Each structure stands twice: as structure tokens, then as C-alpha cells.
Amino acid sequence: MKTFLDWSAYDTYGIGDAYSGIPATGGNYAKAVAVCMHSRDCQSTSKRGVMCPSFRITNDPAHTTEARVAAFKAALNGEYGESPFTDPRLAAAMDLCVSCKGCKKECPSAVDMTLIKTEFLAQKHALVGAPLRTRLFANLPLWTGRYAKLLRFAIGLRNGSTLIARLAEKVLGIAAQKPLPRLATSSFQLPIDGIGTGETGEVFLFADTFSTHFDPQIARAATEILVAAGYKVRPVVPVPDDAEPTRGLCCGRTYLTHGMVDEARREGKRTLAALKPAVDGKIPVIGLEPSCLLSLRDELYCMGLGAEVGELGKQLFLFEEFLAREHAQGRFKLSFKDSTSTVLVHGHCHQKAFGATKALRKVLSWIPGQ
């Protein structure tokens, strides 16, 4: 079996273990599936945490990490025929998996069902093609980068017309009663030479697709804080010989979620090339959207992009992670005004999977009254 992702990290799993239960086919991918030791932590509803959201909602053991592992073992052992990745039983097992990465963090065996699902979808698309809905959502970075005005118009048209909304629900499965997120009227963009004095230090701000086109106020607020603290904030831009030098960079998350690995690898290469100055100069790279920034610290390793990925990982920080580090080292010295407002914090599932919510709570604790 030829895989789309690099599963070599699991190469030594199960050596000498007669009870490892590694499926007959699939190589290292099968070993990634077999790490499950059936502890059934994914069937817990009493513990705090993420895993497993589909079970917590349905209370059906069929929608747990363990059940999905069982389905993959059956598929890779030949129980689902010669084309297991197109078998409806495997599709049913994965249908409610939301790729939260909770199992990678909270499962005692660290089953990475998110990555297993990406490979599954890639294998399936290679056989039967990716459906229109998948291609529409996965290519969001392209639509926003190339056709932002057209996309803004199309979303406005769909949100403003009950008829079009119902048609989109029938064709694409997008709930008609829910409005689609609107693109901002003006996207976020830093000056090419950066902004700020740099008396405290220098950082690169990785403005992802969502921070750039949907919620630019978040990127602007982050920039304002960093500049006020004395940092020079530089944009991450494509290299001059990039195939699309005017299109923003992308972490590849939307492609990975939908099993379009080749496209994710393309975006990973673009971003890796653009961040070479940060790697060479050991300059921190700050991200705002957890699923985007953390994909560069995680899935990028599985795409065969070389040793540079590991070096880049050392320079990547979520905004609050960077502030917490700088504060601990005595460099971040901003004081905040009193606040009597109530702040409700909902940690991103990927943020929780990487233990990054601690930094978020720490930074919020600096605000008097919180």
C-alpha cells in the first residue's frame, strides 16, 4: 500500500510484541492504527477534556476512537474486500470524527485519528475522486486569495436568499438556516518592511487565511499589542520565485482535513520557503489561529518536506504562548487596564491537544479584574 503521508514515525511499533495486533496490510499506517490498547478512555463522559466529542454527543460506542480503530483493522485485514477505503462501513465509522486531535493528547496510546482520517480520505479520493463539497471547502485559501471579491459577493447572495440557501443545502449539504461567515470588507495586511521599533525584539506574524480575510481585527489587535511592547512585526510573505507571489500563505489545514494531501504539501512547501529567514535568523513566528499554526508544528512533519520542518517547529508560537514566554524572560512589560467585563474562554480543540490553553489562561490573568 502506497501512502500519501509519511508514517515512518511508527516504523518500530510492535517489534517483538506478539499481541500488537498490527493489521496484515498498510505498513507503518497500519501500525499507527494498532497503537490503540483498548483502554476505552474515549468512551468517558465524566472526565474533563476533548475526547471523544462524537461519543459525548451520541453516547454511541460506534462513534469512538476505539470503534474507528476496529473498523480500520478490519479494512486493512481484508475484511472489507479489495477496495476497503471506499467501503461504506469505513465511511460510517469516520463520518462523525471531527478531527479534533483529542485522542492524540488524551488517549493513553496517543492514537492520532485526525491524521489516520486524512490518509483514509486521501486513499478514498484517489479511487473515486473528491466530491464538489470537499473541493469547495478545502480550497478556501485559493478562493480567498484569488477571488475574494467574487467570494464575498457569492456569500452575501447565499445568505440573503432563502431559495439559494436551500439549493446550497440540497447540493452541498450546507444548513440553510445558518448564515455563512462573511469576508471582511478589508483584509489584514502588514507593510512589507514590517512595523514597530524593534527595541524589544523582532517577530514574524503568520496571518492565516481566517485572520487575513474573515477576522482581520484579531490580527490588527495582535499587531497593536506587539508594537506597543516594542517588537518589530514583520509579515510572512511568499518568496519572489513562488508560483503565486501575490497570494497569501497557507498552513494546509483545510486540505488536510479533507484528505487533499498533495495540495497540503504544496502549501507546506510555500510556507516553509517563506519562513526560511525566520529559521535562519532564529526569529519567532507568531500564529493566531490554533489549527493553522499547530499544523505547522505537527502535520508538516508527515509530508516529507525535510529536516527544515524540525528547525521551523522550534520557532513557532501561538500569540499567547509567545507573550507568556517573553513575560517569563522579562522582555514583555506591558501593563493592562482594569477590566470588570466577564471573559468567557473556549479553548480550541487543537489548542487543548497541544497543552496550549495554559498560556492563554496565564496571559488573561495579567488583566486586573480577571
Question: Where do the PLM segments sit?
Answer:
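Ferredoxin-type iron-sulfur electron-transfer modules in oxidoreductases and energy-metabolism complexes
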Residues: 2-148, 263-273, 308-313, 317, ...
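Iron-sulfur cluster-binding electron-transfer modules in prokaryotic oxidoreductases
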Residues: 3-5, 114-370
